[in-house]
């Protein structure tokens, strides 16, 4: 997980390359492929012979509306084409809502809930969470990197519970 706008892109790039080089044999990266950190990490994972699985926070056509620049959307589509598997997170309260309730970019609570559900999915199904961000958890946005970090902290606090799955290590 990470910020869409990486302030120190070169440092993030180096950290990612070091992470993948030190991780042993290739494995699987789960990623939302969002602009910024997600796409950077996915590219380096693919260069390092890892499989990448795209975990989209909503149906593809809706998610593509969140890419603000044509170049970012093209990069997303190119990475998506290289993914081993694509999973779309079901719409929150799908019984009560249809696709049109989230049809405008940044449509408040519903869209935020989809990003929050993506964060929950990643925390539940990953063993190591790589965070590229500024470290500020003072005002977490729903589904944002700071909130995902807080979810990771909660999962780590429960890691001795045999019923607990998910994140065992956080790197940032």
Describe the residue ranges of each PLM region:
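Acidic/glycine-enriched connector segments
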Residues: 1-172
